[in-house]
């Protein structure tokens, strides 16, 4: 603790943001970092608590508290204060493989557990984390680190989302020969296709993929592991297989959409938007929202991202229907929190896009089954040519589970407290095992699964488990 009075002298200052009315016209990142002097002041606010709950990562009565990666937060906050960025990087990456991801998209449960936040404002832990890793890339401290020797053991990681990448990174540094297979055209999974560029730039994801490739990880794209012949081949060619395919099965909308065009799920809409805007794909599965009246069902990050994406595509109008009443979302001061997308909609349209306590009752169609509008439970009819469902996920897609013969019921069943499935040498981790969760929990799952796979291969492990 370099400055015992830091939390008394300095107030919380978050990274600034670009003007909502301006940023909706491009796909560039909207957060702007603080100057180094102000960032060091934010590091000085850390109290170096006797019990740093920020890094506990525990689940109590069904609620998660603190960082599941057990980030050494007080240590690198102190190093930010002293300007020792290199040492801060070494302590940060000891627990977190991808701070450039969590520093952008994590809801920061560490800050909710910050002792400084009990009677004041918590430390800007997420922003501080991002500043350390971005400084490391800018100063070229982040260089490829190949293992000193290879074990000769071959591991296949199926899926290249945050859990799969974290496991691959850990196992590669342990010296195993790691191949990551991905059914999409590019690796990254949710990070590449499920989060808009303005929140998580795709060049940031690709930068990490390139670094891992230089360190020895092999990526194979366009390979669908739900094919039984492919699954058998992978099991025969590799000493261990780790399934990290996410929980991408969307929760049904409960509407009669048979024969109706203009209805999709949030993940489909976001993926198509990324493919067009960032990956240069001319045709995508879901049409652009340009010139359309868009209605989004659901709340949470995916729904907000769909609002922001529709605005950038030039929609005519956008409305977000939230099932629960507005009172359920008010903070302690009776204010309604607004996500970045809601701020943008307010700036562009002059109104909050959310309507609370309302659901879609039925659909209105025109010629050839084209969606024309939606009838809501309060008796209103909204014009709508694109209806997007963002109501969460039911679990993992069954195809890969069936191909590998692993037992699953929405999520893959593994040994109690572990990651081994009912099939010899096949493991599972991430949302596929845990269910829909945060990127930071997926990374924690990947790290812990890597330790178990390493134990299986070598008879012992020196890899750390996060959960």
Identify what each model region corresponds to.
Residues 40-44, 48-56, 62-145, 213, ...:
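Glycine/serine-rich phosphate-binding loop and adjoining beta1-alpha1 elements at the start
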Residues 13, 18, 23-34, 42-45, ...:
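C-terminal catalytic lobe of FAD-dependent flavoproteins
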Residues 289-324, 363, 380-388, 393, ...:
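Long hydrophobic segments that form regular secondary structure
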Residues 87, 149, 154-158, 206-255, ...:
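Feature captures the FAD/FMN-dependent oxidoreductase FAD-binding
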């Amino acid at each position: 603790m370099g400055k015992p009075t830091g939390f008394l002298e300095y107030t919380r200052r978050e990274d600034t943001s670009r003007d909502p009315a301006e940023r909706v016209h491009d796909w560039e990142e909207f957060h702007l970092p603080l100057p180094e002097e102000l960032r060091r002041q934010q590091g000085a606010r850390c109290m170096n608590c006797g019990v740093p709950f920020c890094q506990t990562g525990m689940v109590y009565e069904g609620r998660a508290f603190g960082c599941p990666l057990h980030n050494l937060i007080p240590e690198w906050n102190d190093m930010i204060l002293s300007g020792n960025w290199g040492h801060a990087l070494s302590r940060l990456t000891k627990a977190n493989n991808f701070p450039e991801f969590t520093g952008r998209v994590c809801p920061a449960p560490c800050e909710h557990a910050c002792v400084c936040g009990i009677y004041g404002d918590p430390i800007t832990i997420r922003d501080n984390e991002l500043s350390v890793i971005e400084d490391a890339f800018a100063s070229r401290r982040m260089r490829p680190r190949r293992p000193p020797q290879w074990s000769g053991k071959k591991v296949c990681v199926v899926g290249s989302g945050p859990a799969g990448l974290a496991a691959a990174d850990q196992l590669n540094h342990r010296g195993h020969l790691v191949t990551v297979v991905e059914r999409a055209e590019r690796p990254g999974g949710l990070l590449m296709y499920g989060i808009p560029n303005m929140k998580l730039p795709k060049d940031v994801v690709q930068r990490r993929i390139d670094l891992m490739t230089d360190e020895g990880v092999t990526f194979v794209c366009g390979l669908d592991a739900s094919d039984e012949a492919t699954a058998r081949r992978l099991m025969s060619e590799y000493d261990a297989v780790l399934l990290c395919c996410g929980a991408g099965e969307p929760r049904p909308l409960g509407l009669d959409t048979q024969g109706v065009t203009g209805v999709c799920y949030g993940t489909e809409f976001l993926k198509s938007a990324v493919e067009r805007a960032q990956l240069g794909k001319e045709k995508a599965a879901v049409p652009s929202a340009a010139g359309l009246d868009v209605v989004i069902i659901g709340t949470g990050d995916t729904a907000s991202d769909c609002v922001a994406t529709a605005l950038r595509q030039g929609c005519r109008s956008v409305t977000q229907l939230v099932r629960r009443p507005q009172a359920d979302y008010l903070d302690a001061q009776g204010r309604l929190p607004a996500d970045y997308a809601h701020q943008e909609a307010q700036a562009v349209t002059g109104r909050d896009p959310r309507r609370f306590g309302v659901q879609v009752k039925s659909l209105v169609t025109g010629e050839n089954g084209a969606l024309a509008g939606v009838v809501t439970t309060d008796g209103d009819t909204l014009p709508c040519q694109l209806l997007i469902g963002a109501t969460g996920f039911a679990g993992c897609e069954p195809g890969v589970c069936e191909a590998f013969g692993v037992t699953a019921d929405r999520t893959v069943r593994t040994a109690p407290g572990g990651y081994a499935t009912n099939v010899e040498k096949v493991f599972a981790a991430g949302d596929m095992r845990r269910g829909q969760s945060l990127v930071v929990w997926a990374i924690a799952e990947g790290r812990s699964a890597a330790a178990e796979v390493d134990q299986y291969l070598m008879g012992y492990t020196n890899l750390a488990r996060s959960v």
